[in-house]
UniProtKB/Swiss-Prot annotation:
Signal peptide (residue range): 1-38
Protein name in UniProt: Collagen alpha-1(XXVII) chain B
Taxonomic source organism: Danio rerio (Zebrafish)
Its biological purpose: May play a role during the calcification of cartilage and the transition of cartilage to bone. Together with col27a1a, plays a role in development of the notochord and axial skeleton.
Propeptide: 1421-1658
Tissue specificity: Weakly expressed in the notochord from the 6 somite stage. Expressed throughout the notochord at 13 somites, then becomes restricted to the distal tip of the notochord by 24 hpf. Also expressed in head cartilages by 48 hpf.
Domain (Fibrillar collagen NC1): residue spans on this chain: 1458-1658
GO terms for MF: extracellular matrix structural constituent conferring tensile strength; metal ion binding
Organism phylogeny: Eukaryota, Metazoa, Chordata, Craniata, Vertebrata
Amino acid sequence: MEPDNTPSSRLRAAGVGGRAVFFCMVLYCTCCLRLAQAQSADVDVLQRLGLVGKRPPQGFIPIKSGVILTTRARIDVPVSSVIPVSLGSTFSIILSVCSHRINNAFLFTIVTKRKRLHLGVQFIPGQILVYLGQNSSVNFDYNVHNGQWHNLALEIQGQKVTLYTSCGNTSIQANLDFQNEETLDSEGSFRLGKMSQNSVQFEGAICQFDIHPSAQAAHNYCKYIKKQCREADTYRPNLPPLLPLLPLDPNRSTIQTPKVVTDINERHLSLTRDKMNINHEGQTTVPPMITQPTLQLPLQTTAQTTASIRNRTSQISPKPTQQNRKKAKKERNKLHILKEHQISVTDSPTSQQQNQVDIPTTTTPELSSTFRVSEMTTLAAQRPLPKETSFFEAKATFFESVTPAAMDGLQTFDLEPTQYSLLELTGLKGEPGLPGPPGPPGQPGLPGKRGPRGPSGPHGKPGPPGTPGPKGKKGNPGISPGRAPSGIKGDPGLVGLPGQPGQPGRKGQKGHPGPSGHPGDQGIRGPDGSPGAKGYPGRQGLPGPIGNMGPKGVRGFIGIPGIFGLPGADGERGLPGVPGKKGKMGRPGFPGDFGERGPPGPDGNPGEIGAPGPVGIPGFIGDMGPVGMVGPPGLIGPKGVPGNPGEPGLKGDKGELGLPGEPGEPGFQGDKGIQGSPGLPGVQGKPGPQGKIGDRGPDGLPGPLGPEGFPGDIGPPGQNGVEGPKGNAGVRGIPGPGGLPGLEGDQGPVGPAGAPGLEGRPGRKGISGNPGEEGMKGEPGMTGNPGMLGERGPVGFVGPFGEMGLAGEKGDRGETGQPGPPGEKGAMGHPGAPGERGLSGPAGAPGPHGSRGLSGTRGPKGTRGARGPDGPVGEKGMMGMKGPEGPPGKQGLSGQMGKIGETGEAGPTGFTGVQGPTGPPGAKGILGEPGPQGSPGVLGPLGEIGAIGLPGKAGDQGLPGEPGEKGAVGSPGNIGEQGLIGPRGDPGVDGEAGPSGPDGAKGEQGDVGLEGESGEKGVIGFKGTEGRTGDPGLIGVKGPEGKPGKIGERGKPGEKGSKGHQGQLGEMGALGEQGDTGFIGPKGSRGTTGFMGAPGKMGQQGEPGLVGYEGHQGPQGSLGSPGPKGEKGEQGDDGKVEGPPGPSGDIGPVGNRGDRGEPGDPGYPGLEGVQGERGKEGAPGVPGNSGPRGFPGPKGSKGNKGPKGKNSPRGESGNRGSPGPVGVPGPRGVIGREGFEGEPGLDGAAGKDGAKGMPGDLGRDGDVGLPGKPGPQGNAGAPGLPGVQGSFGPKGERGITGHSGPPGKRGLNGGMGFPGKQGDQGFKGQPGDAGEQGFPGVLGIFGPQGPPGDFGPVGIQGPKGPQGLMGMQGAIGPVGIIGPSGNPGPQGDKGNKGEMGVQGPRGPPGPRGPPGPPGLPAVAFSHENEALGAALHVFDSRSALRSEMYQDTDLPLLDQGSEIFKTLHYLSILIHSIKNPLGTQENPARMCRDLLECEHRLNDGTYWIDPNLGCSSDNIEVTCSFTSGGQTCLKPVTASKLEIGVSLIQMNFIHLLSSEAVQIITVHCLNVSVWASEDSKTPSSSMVYFKAWDGQIIEAGGFIEPDLLKDECWITDGRWHQTQFIFRTQDPNLLPIVEIYNLPSTKPGSHYHLEVGPVCFL
């Protein structure tokens, strides 16, 4: 035998060893290939979508830890480009996300080509919803919307869905009762961040989004979390104060031990469909303790533990302690998550025996290993830890050990010392194990990529095929290249025999994309995204303990709209309230004309800090450390995160005048300045154009109690009161006047036999008749004479009624009987036909002189009186002195009466209340005593006409009763049926003349009669005697408007009474109707001249009177002395409107009477003259006969303007006119738009130093140690993550001014810092020195109207300015609200007598003008066209000026430039109103959400919308719920019907503009079931089902099911119950519900009725 060391034996040994090595290599390569294939099958969704590059699509912002989705993010790609179609029903989804906005958005959805949902994950507040198909979903109680990073995994394995958190330690499982057999549609679409185009967008950051085809990946998903996602994880605890981030020390070991969680809150699951029963279970898995001697730790175990670092050896125990329980419970209540703690220690050569941590094992104690940990040499050496702190929390970042575990003895490697990135512990070198038996070949794997050419092996004999072995567990992922340890170099193998060339292998399939590469460098910051859509409001949570005031919360979840409540009862009138605070600024009105630029205002306070920018990634909050020695300057680090804003500095010195800047943004309105001292009178400016009517000022203090007000409007009729007891008989009333003759009654029964009549006179003897023929045989003879009167017999029985006898002849008219008892009041008869007007009665005798009556209301316009005689020539007055300048006048008189406002629309009808159960009948009460006579009730509603009763039997003739007293007035009976029109009655007897009635209402204007002949001059009457002075009467309450009385005769004029005392001002009575014209009485004698009366209030402008007769020409007055020259008056308004009549000129001398001229041709009728002064009352003329109505004459042309007359003397003050009627308040003006912001005020002066703050609480940290020596210069550190903005420290005391440093170089422009917190408002600084005159800036946008300033002292009256140019005619403004009447002003001094004017000659009548052009048709402007119509009105006024052909050349031309500018201004307002609707019927919005986005301070209520923005005739009145995110709610026509009064087109637009809808339908039932049966409590066969708007059927167990809020109708206990159905869907086309089927049939004792709630769209 050859020895073993021979070459052949060595060759055999080498061959055996080489085959073993080759087998191991093949096995290792196979494992690696399997691992690579498994990893290659994983899908990195972000990489597939192209979101991890330097330039992501629009709407995505790249960050170091992933990508941020904004509202502009749009990802909708085919599924095949993201997920392999071969993905089965078992896979895992690993997510690392952070939500920035609370809403109900989907993270992703996979939709089939038929737009059906296949797979989707939705984050709602407090829950995660996973959709598997269109109708199946499951939700987990897990809150993602808390602003922190969340690492989680979802395992989907057939019918089972499991949510893993805490690195797999916590899982919640849900099972579905059906198998989702739908496969992935290759033609479907993948959407990221939303479900559909109209749904809400997910706003937040995504660091990792991977899909693994294996369900095992979710069990320990932390192994697959990327590095940058771990660093961004905010579940890890923050660093303690005064400890910065630890550097990545290669000598540091990071240990993490699991903690047994003893109590975990049960996770609740719920399904949205009733047919899915889910078995949920809460389980907690704890990874096993470490058993390998190489200290292989789990990657990231999110359990919780507490360890202590002591000076002695300490053992980390996995058992829970009391401290652990308390802290775990606290953290669970706070965040509902499990946090991680770890211990970080470093090796040090100083002490290697002091600290040692033993890691015990759980299964193999003999393999436990020990490693040593030394004291920390980091910052803890410079500053000791607090005594109470036994550990500190550091960033929980873990990496897997790079030492692979031994593979159950099948393979052995010589191990080098283990290399760690953070775990640098060298394991023991293992002994080589025995070679194990070859395993069976595994299942064929996927064809891999073509590998490098391997060495040629020996040709072995083909072995028998083995049975396929079981699938091995997935191995741990390999270590990244460069970090893996190099294996022990093996012995060189022998050179193998050259193998035969193998057949070329088949071409491998294209592999899946490889794993994602290392994260790239920080990309360029993309543009800021558009603001995101408003999220759905969250559901209301359970009330927690009262915490500190938090930040402004997000909008709440869409609530169920409540039932509209009934209006409450009217409350009692409260006491007058305290004057309220100044109200908020009203909406600005229409813009006024542009005024001149005012002087610059004082420096304003600093404005508010702007809104904060987008929230950055939260960093770790570090506190300020102790000040150390100044070290050498380090390298320039990267640009840091902008710091917090500093304290505002002191106001600097005034700089030099700079160049004019760009026009600034409108600033906020400055505070009201301090009242300045009165300045000198300025130069009189040009009068500006007339301004708009200003906003109503603040309400003044309550004035004294006014006079008694007018009676209020008649209120609505109250409910019928309880019938009161019968009242006592009233006093017999005065017999009323005789009524009209009634209809002829039916023939009455035969009356009793009348008394025998008086014996008549004997008749005349008749004429002898002819002898008669022989008569027939006579009848038996008549009964003989009665015998003697016998005794009275007994009363016999009542005999039967005899037959009705024949009607006898009409008897003579009997005497008038006694008045019978008053009969019952008959039914209200129908009003009779109006009677004809009676003749005027004869003139009555003149009555006695009456006392002076109260001041009557203003009568109608009288007819033109006859021309009176010439008055005497007045004496020449003395020249008056020029009076002193009067004080400024008080508030002017009230304006003209406003237009009558339109009647408001009826309010919405409230929902019908639920009918209460009928109560049991009460016990009969004791008969009460008759109560006092009640006040007459309100007229009750008319009852229905009763059916005609059967005729009763005729009673016996009653005895005539005694005349009864007059009964009380009965309640009005029901309206009887229409009776036949009776015959016209006889004319009544002329009654006596009644008293004079009040003035009747003004009648319509009658036809113009022919001009009567001039009457003869009446005789001058005698002067009456003066009456006595009457007492002033009290102010009477306004009585009801009386009916016009009969026309009384005109009484003789009474004697003139003496002047009475001035009575109190009576209230304005209602305008009476115009009565008929009375007879003209004789003219009274001229009375004596009364005293000068007090000036009365300004009366309303009377109607133009009839043109009076031309007066006689008076004598020529003497020429008065010229008065002082008056000041030149201001130019008046445009003369298009008739001006007030000028004073009458002096009467000229009477000329000689000329010869009678020839009658001239009839002149053209002139224009209607200006209302002349009322002439003296002429003598009454004889009334002429009414002539036929003449044809209207043609309108004459306007005559030439006559010469200007001389100023006549000022007439005496007229008598005090009666106050005009109070006008009806006009319609409320349209609320104007919110004005633009004003220009920013100047910076205010620096505030004074604040007071020294209170000393803070003593911190738990120890004293600060002595500063250490300066350390060596460190290398430039990597830029850290941006930290969360720290809390503002207390304001320090003002330091002493330091020495001025050397001037530094000009630095680079710094980045935009975060906006600082708004500082306390400083005291108002002293006004600064006036600056130099700057260049005129660009005209800014008009700011809102400021608050009214305090009234300053009256300044010195300035000189009168020059006459201004005529202003343009402004646009017609809205009718203002009629203001209260002002107090009458004091009586002014008598004015100076004017200069005598020269009387001008009377001009001839002008020629007749041509007929005018036809007028334009009327145009009904809507609200949107008001401004445009006003602009057109401005231009039409210019054309009117040209058409009327004024000859006055003094009128200035209109400024076309300013007119065009004003038109453009109106057009801009019009466009603004279209873009920003008000929600009124004239200016509707498309949806309520538009109003919410345009106006942020609207209240919930009724608004108008027009979804199709078409004609205003189909506008919809809706209820807007802005507190629910801008819901648009459509109410049904009635609360018990499903009909909604919206057209089909408008409803289609509402569906297009909405993304979700909700509606509630309630069925009120009594002993009847509509859903569940009483036995099974499950939907019965007789349940109702619904028809949606698009025709789909909604029923239990169907494709779409209704949700139940309450189902109590199965209870049949004789009481009313209800079942509430809620329909909430993200397909708005389903609502509203249009029909309900299978409603139950009611039986005796069972009822139901519907209550249909509004349908709300969002």
